[in-house]
């Protein structure tokens, strides 16, 4: 009888490769596996995958989790409300992750396609969830294509940098520093008129002030 692997494909592939390489080594000839009931349906399979990799001992990377959310939403027609119930994530988180995944797949990775580029997924999540950046995008003051190039060119050191990107884009001189040099250079330019741009203390003071007003 033949069995279909519904989870653990990478592990099964590795065992198959090693079995061909080490023909006389019996430990690569078999692999421990759970055999599921023959009549198990798609929803049960999807739940097993989520339980294993979103909450289990072998979690997927943030990028892989987003890809699964995208698959369930687009290919399996799972609503955001249903995904909320299954994942315990907020609908806004799910939507931002799916959109960030689409941004990378459709615009970023075709141009910057090294395997290591996927670790920059958090940059795109931050881009999508930032309300000030959304306003700038809607006004046509920044495009996803521009953002992709800035990420691909190494303008940012970490995903957290994106949280301050709107400050830079709202200042013409700082924006030019970003384009010509780096995000760090843009912050140094911006710091001359806005101390909160680089200072965590001033940043917290500014946040408190916004909360009061």
PLM features: what roles do these ranges have?
Residues 1, 23-29, 86, 113-213:
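Accessory, typically intrinsically disordered or conformationally flexible segments
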Residues 18, 57-61, 119-121:
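Glycine-rich loops and low-complexity Gly/Arg-rich segments
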Residues 110:
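Basic, glycine-/proline-tolerant helical and adjacent loop/strand elements
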């Amino acid at each position: 009888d033949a069995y279909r692997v519904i989870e653990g494909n990478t592990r099964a592939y590795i065992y198959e490769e090693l079995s061909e390489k080490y023909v006389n080594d019996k430990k690569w000839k078999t692999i421990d596996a759970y055999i599921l009931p023959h009549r198990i349906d798609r929803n049960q399979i999807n739940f097993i995958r989520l339980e294993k990799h979103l909450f289990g001992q072998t979690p997927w990377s943030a990028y892989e989790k987003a890809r699964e959310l995208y698959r369930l939403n687009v290919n399996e027609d799972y609503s955001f409300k249903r995904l909320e119930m299954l994942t315990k994530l907020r609908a806004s988180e799910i939507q931002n992750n799916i959109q960030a995944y689409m941004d990378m797949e459709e615009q970023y990775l075709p141009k910057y396609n090294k395997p290591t580029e996927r670790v920059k997924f958090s940059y795109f999540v931050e881009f999508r969830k930032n309300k000030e950046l959304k306003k700038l995008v809607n006004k046509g003051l920044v495009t996803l294509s521009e953002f992709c190039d800035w990420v691909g060119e190494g303008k940012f050191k970490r995903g957290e940098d994106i949280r301050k990107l709107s400050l830079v884009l709202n200042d013409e001189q700082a924006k030019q520093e970003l384009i010509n040099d780096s995000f760090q250079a843009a912050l140094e330019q911006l710091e001359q008129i806005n101390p909160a741009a680089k200072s965590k203390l001033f940043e917290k003071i500014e946040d408190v002030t916004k909360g009061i007003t």
